[in-house]
Amino acid sequence: MPSFDIVSEIDTQEVRNAVENATRDLSTRWDFRHVTARFEFDEKQKSIKVTSESDFQVKQMLEIISEKLAKRGIEGGALDISAEILHSGKTYSLDAKLKQGIESLKAKKLVKLIKDSKLKVQAQIQGEQVRVTGKSRNDLQAVMALIRTGDLGQPFQFNNFRD
């Protein structure tokens, strides 16, 4: 029986490259001359910290990192950006966590979306991934198209496709 897994994974090497490109971009921008601004990528916490001297610059830096991540193939929905900008001393900072894996609540919504489509497939939650099995490849491809168009606020990848 054909099957595939729905996962949400992020390549940390690509994130690191995007952060380095964004840092390089900051050094060439005129509006960031003589300003203390930096990006910090924490691989263990899976987060990007944006720090600058004003909240407006933090917002600009967030746009820069989003653009660089998109160029590297990481969708904007992969970032979980904190709502408020933290201010301490003369610096403003913002944390953006990377969404890795599928949470149980999101997995339940995913399974419900698949079941509501009335396609002849079964979806099972297996840890941080969802396995979809069906009798025909066409049904599985229809599920893939459904998930790509469904707005669940997180990018999904399909792997382990078996025929």
Curated annotation (Swiss-Prot):
User: Which SUPFAM superfamilies does its entry note?
Assistant: YajQ-like
Q: Which GO terms describe its molecular function?
A: nucleotide binding
Family affiliation: Belongs to the YajQ family.
Alphabetical list of HAMAP family matching this protein: YajQ
Source organism: Hamiltonella defensa subsp. Acyrthosiphon pisum (strain 5AT)
Keyword entries, A-Z: Nucleotide-binding
Q: What is the role of this chain?
A: Nucleotide-binding protein.
Can you list the GO cellular component terms from the UniProt entry? cytosol
Q: Which Pfam families match?
A: DUF520 (PF04461)
The protein's name:
Nucleotide-binding protein HDEF_1968
Please give the superkingdom of this protein's source: Bacteria
